UniProtKB/Swiss-Prot annotation:
Pfam family, one: Lipoprotein_18
Protein name: Outer membrane protein assembly factor BamC
One GO process term, biological-process aspect: protein insertion into membrane
Function: Part of the outer membrane protein assembly complex, which is involved in assembly and insertion of beta-barrel proteins into the outer membrane.
Record gene name: bamC
Signal peptide (from-to): 1-16
Organism for this UniProt entry: Pasteurella multocida (strain Pm70)
GO terms under cellular component: cell outer membrane
UniProt keywords, alphabetically: Cell outer membrane, Lipoprotein, Membrane, Palmitate, Signal
Record localization: Cell outer membrane
Lipidation (S-diacylglycerol cysteine): 17
Topology versus the membrane: Lipid-anchor
Amino acid sequence: MKKWLFPFAFVATLAGCSVSNESKQQANDTYQKSDAALPLFAPLNTAGVSLPKQDTTYQLPQVKVKKADQVDIRPPETPLAIIQNSIAQFDGERALIAYPIDKREVYNLQQVARLLKEQGIGYQLTNEKIVTDWAPTGRADEIGDTQVRYEIEQVSSGNYSALFVSILQMKRNEVVFSPHLADKQRYSSDRLNQLVGELDASYRKQVRDLNNSGLMPIQSVLGTDSNGRTALVLGAPFNHAWTKLGQVLPQLEFDIKDEIIGRGVRELKYRPAGAKSWWWPFGRAEGSSGLKTGTYFMQLSALGKQSAVVMTDDDGNALSGEQAQALYQALQNLLAK
């Protein structure tokens, strides 16, 4: 049987690498011993010799010093402006990040609720406000079992929307305590940065996936959607279809004016080029059966690994008849390339 002998120096090195969380939060210096009594010196034995009287100028005063509370030496946490064109700060009670309102579809309470559910954190969502159950902080430098109840709120005003995170309660090892200002800033900012960071990473990954998948051709057939409207059923998932449609619609003289990917909606402006426009072969020579100049909407719905696109006019009526046939056949041809 082989015996493994570890040098003492190696074992000592491993022991030296172990750092307790107490040392991460509290300084181990003379400040911790500030309540120690000052030294007293007994009078010198003069042996009959007359000595000059002691000068009290530099005598240390005997003052009773009361040691203050333990000081948390961890660096403060601050909200980070992770979102482009955003502003982040701590206002004394809440950590907040304000961002352009057009990003509200990505950074909102519904997305925050999804993250909390994935993390196994219980919550109640009412009136644009989330109140969580007790949740671990997720920090590696905690002493004991520290848990927090958070309040997360979304507010929109003008051209901006904002997410707020505040601390409702804190407890350590099942003992509830009142957080100091530094605690409120640290834990509210930490949770806000974590939530917004994950939402931002998820959004960027979705954009990359959309850009990468949009190059592949898509096969499609004419059918109906779940509401019985004439639709083009695409043999591709939502993300792939969304990107590909964004590439081919301008080729059919549709300008994309606005889009909300979270709802699968695009607002389009159609400006036909005349009798030689793409729809001319499907109508009469004068082109009277073609689409008219105006605003249209594209609605894309997910159907498992497939998706369906429906084109509607400005009043929300789905295109039908010769107009739908012409448009969807043109889309079929371009999507398959």
